[in-house]
Every structure is written in C-alpha cells, then in structure tokens.
Amino acid sequence: MSLASRRKVRIRLYGTNPADVEQVAREIVDLAKKMGVQVRGPIPLPTRRLIVTVRRAPSGQGYHTFDHWEMRISKRLIDIEASERVLRRLMTIRVPDTVKIELQLI
C-alpha cells in the first residue's frame, strides 16, 4: 500500500458508562489487529467528574438540605494507521447510545 492511501486516525471515545466505552474500544482494537494495521491504545484518559449541588427545599424556608448529583465521563484514545478499507469497516461497529466517538485525521 502506498503512503498516500494510509492515514493516521485518532479515535476518541467518551461516555457515561465505562463498561460500554471499554467494550467499543476493545472491538476497535480487535478489528484493527485483525486487518493487520498498526494500532496504539486504548489509552485511558482521566475520568471527568461533573458534580451538581441543588437545594432540596425550593422555597428557601426550613432546613438547609442539599442533594449532590454526579456524572462521570470516561474517555479512551486510540491511534490507528489505517487505510480507507479499514475506516469503512470501523463504521460498521455497533456503538451504544451512551458512547460518543470522534474521528480525527492526523
């Protein structure tokens, strides 16, 4: 294959369910290895914690009680040196609704 037909692709996966993110990352790496392309990853990135504190009593009267809500966002990074054929196969992977994917050509 010529160098022009191969490109480096950076895949960012993120989602609120860490098991789903890990499963999709594993499927991408398995597919890339099966097709014989060079792959780096999945590289775990720091988990982001979003915390929202809300007051329980809407009127402002009574005790000062608060609820704390938290959402964790797990992230993985995968680098693949892939051809157009591999990228087309990547598009066939079933991705749960809780996982978002960003593709970036480097």
Swiss-Prot record:
Transmembrane segments: none annotated. SUPFAM superfamilies: Ribosomal protein S10. It comes from the Archaea. GO terms for cellular component: cytosolic small ribosomal subunit. It holds the Pfam family Ribosomal_S10. GO terms for molecular function: structural constituent of ribosome; tRNA binding. GO terms for biological process: translation. Keywords: Ribonucleoprotein, Ribosomal protein. SMART domains: Ribosomal_S10 (SM01403). Part of the 30S ribosomal subunit. HAMAP family: Ribosomal_uS10. Involved in the binding of tRNA to the ribosomes. Belongs to the universal ribosomal protein uS10 family. This is Small ribosomal subunit protein uS10. The lineage of its organism: Archaea, Thermoproteota, Thermoprotei, Thermoproteales, Thermoproteaceae.
